[in-house]
Amino acid sequence: MIIDWYPGHMKKARQQIIDLLPRIDVFLEVLDARLPASSANPVLERLRSDKPCIKVLNKNDLADQQVTKQWVSALQSQQGVRALPLEARNRAEVNKIIGLCRILAPNRGRPGRSLRVMVVGIPNVGKSTLINTLAGKKIARVGDKPAITTCPQQIDLRNGVLLHDSPGLLWPVMDNPDGASRLAVSGAIGDNALDYVAVALYGLAFMLDRYPRQLRERYKLSEETTDPGEVLESIGRKRGCLVSGGQIDSYRAAEVFLRELRAGTLGRISLEQPDDVAPVDSNDD
């Protein structure tokens, strides 16, 4: 699956990030804990250069805990990177970020020398929710649709830390087929840019391979059901996703599956492991 989807505001956001870079002390990149590599924008990685970075693995409550431990180890092997799994609405977990920022930029955060933190991430990874929790009030708009934040914001946390929010930023062409498909399954890409049924079939094939027990228990599938198309049809029949003549409405069945997978109804699922992922070209020229 090759996805070419780059709204105009994202090109503008990239330039805004570049303009702010000289003033930034720490990067705070918000990732989806279920797919930390695919939800990491390689353009942002290149832009931050050697600035210290905290990679927040948000939606940790939805991810496979054992796989998340592997990701923390893999990410912290990178120069200047600290990894922190959390759930963005959990204030106690989120408050750990400030302490890490002070460790990474020890000469900042004092009177007259604010510690400036740029919060970055692709759409729909929970960046706005995290900012609201850090601020202790609603600052950024929150929703389950990608690309809600469209202009930069500066938020003074009143503790010597200034947050610089930026719009969710995808890269111009996502030509890594598996990475693009995993992003689509997670909901990071607007569903109107996708073949929804194809996304569901990819997700079902993944579940049959990695988490077959959870899939079969949720939808009462037999052990003999191993084809993603058959599973989608079974889900459609059992959930009443039918059209005239008793045929399956594949789109509605896909909606049921993807909605439940994204919400964690199928259990704690990680969509990729460190060994699954090859380096991604930023393609930002």
PLM regions: where:
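Helix-rich effector regions associated with P-loop NTPase G domains
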Residues: M1-F27, R34-L35, A40-C53, N60, ...
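Canonical P-loop GTPase G-domain recognition
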Residues: I54, N60-G121, I139, G240-C241
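Generic structural marker for isolated residues within well-ordered, non-membrane alpha-helices
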Residues: V72, S128, L232
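Short, well-ordered alpha-helical segments in soluble proteins
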Residues: C101-R108, P123, L134-K138, P146, ...
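Solvent-exposed alpha-helices and their adjacent loops that cap or buttress functional pockets
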Residues: P111-G112, T133-L134, I155-D156
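Glycine-rich phosphate-binding P-loop
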Residues: V117-V142, S166
